[in-house]
Amino acid sequence: MDYISTRDASRTPARFSDILLGGLAPDGGLYLPATYPQLDDAQLSKWREVLANEGYAALAAEVISLFVDDIPVEDIKAITARAYTYPKFNSEDIVPVTELEDNIYLGHLSEGPTAAFKDMAMQLLGELFEYELRRRNETINILGATSGDTGSSAEYAMRGREGIRVFMLTPAGRMTPFQQAQMFGLDDPNIFNIALDGVFDDCQDVVKAVSADAEFKKDNRIGAVNSINWARLMAQVVYYVSSWIRTTTSNDQKVSFSVPTGNFGDICAGHIARQMGLPIDRLIVATNENDVLDEFFRTGDYRVRSSADTHETSSPSMDISRASNFERFIFDLLGRDATRVNDLFGTQVRQGGFSLADDANFEKAAAEYGFASGRSTHADRVATIADVHSRLDVLIDPHTADGVHVARQWRDEVNTPIIVLETALPVKFADTIVEAIGEAPQTPERFAAIMDAPFKVSDLPNDTDAVKQYIVDAIANTSVK
């Protein structure tokens, strides 16, 4: 399987094991398979049997083997078996699917170690990184940015692993107390939390700036686990497959997905699954007040907001005004025209955005690629949480409420079951839950102690050079071997 950059018109091929540890391509683009594997009826039938008889980890090995041909299949099976286990995940199904109400289902992605859907990819990445580093006798320094859940998922997946340090940037004061406690309370000598004076997009910009410095990246062995890393999307494709299987009984049945998203990572995996031939009807983008993606799918205008115009909302993991994975979809939408994508994302996005409203390709977003969208407000979230709790006796977090609210908007127009992809357990967003139902969510027993742990975090200015120096100093003063 060859991989190409979204900005490389020459389509220089790369191998999976090389892009696994790197993140961004050298030209600043994002990696995608040169061609998507194609599924047929026999493959889908086989996967139904694998999930039923062998479980999620075995299905994951089947899916991932389509994208990875430079790791032996038996090793892939061992890696997925370690990544997706019970009781590491709180359900033997790993990703259960339950019916919420008429034609709307919940895909439970928050059964993992940090109660967030990011665990689905991060647990696999932890195993893959350690495997590949050991194979190469190398070390890596993972640099990432998080608006909430990515950081804790990455840190719990990478802690204690041979050859790995983690440097995670967070927007100072913009995460919930539970999210801060999960990250900052983690006691591991090779986990480094950095609270940056800015919003999430500032953190993401610093990560991209550091990664774009080829010399610094090489000298300090910088890698990435944010959703720009292809392996994360690859891992997420698996639960689209498993959720489709659990919701249907025959291969000609389609489903739709309503996906809360800010960074376009989770739903990009759905796009890839659909391109492979998984029977998906609609991919519904659910945003909060930071609705840059909803605006694009309604109008064709991709208008990046400034930090000052990025709203602080009650679904904070989606408080993103520049969707870093969106480039992958636009690459496909524009017929894989890397020269044009390079102009759009290398130049025009830096100047505030671009418009495809008058481009004939824009109509394909809905007609050919199945996308739809909607937005949710704080009032919508609170009302949805309260309604789902009082009528259905189910408690959902604010981001999942965004997904349910938007799914309900589309239910009458979509003739398939809609699976809302859960993003986190309610305990991570207690203030909003209290506002919605009048009481705090119960803290699962496995998380009871984290709120009392002392914090380990460094405050830094919104400055790339300051972050670089911090990384250099930390590497010099710690060992991962």
From Swiss-Prot:
Catalytic activity: O-phospho-L-homoserine + H2O = L-threonine + phosphate
Keywords: Amino-acid biosynthesis, Lyase, Pyridoxal phosphate, Threonine biosynthesis
PROSITE patterns per record: DEHYDRATASE_SER_THR
UniProt pathway: Amino-acid biosynthesis; L-threonine biosynthesis; L-threonine from L-aspartate: step 5/5
Modified residues (N6-(pyridoxal phosphate)lysine): K118
Database matches in SUPFAM superfamilies: Tryptophan synthase beta subunit-like PLP-dependent enzymes
Transmembrane segments: none
Entry superkingdom: Bacteria
KW Lyase (keyword) present: yes
Lyase keyword on record: yes
Biological process per Gene Ontology, one example term: threonine biosynthetic process
Biological role stated in the UniProt entry: Catalyzes the gamma-elimination of phosphate from L-phosphohomoserine and the beta-addition of water to produce L-threonine.
Complexes and interactors: Monomer.
Name of the protein described by the UniProt record: Threonine synthase
Natural source organism: Corynebacterium glutamicum (strain ATCC 13032 / DSM 20300 / JCM 1318 / BCRC 11384 / CCUG 27702 / LMG 3730 / NBRC 12168 / NCIMB 10025 / NRRL B-2784 / 534)
Primary gene name: thrC
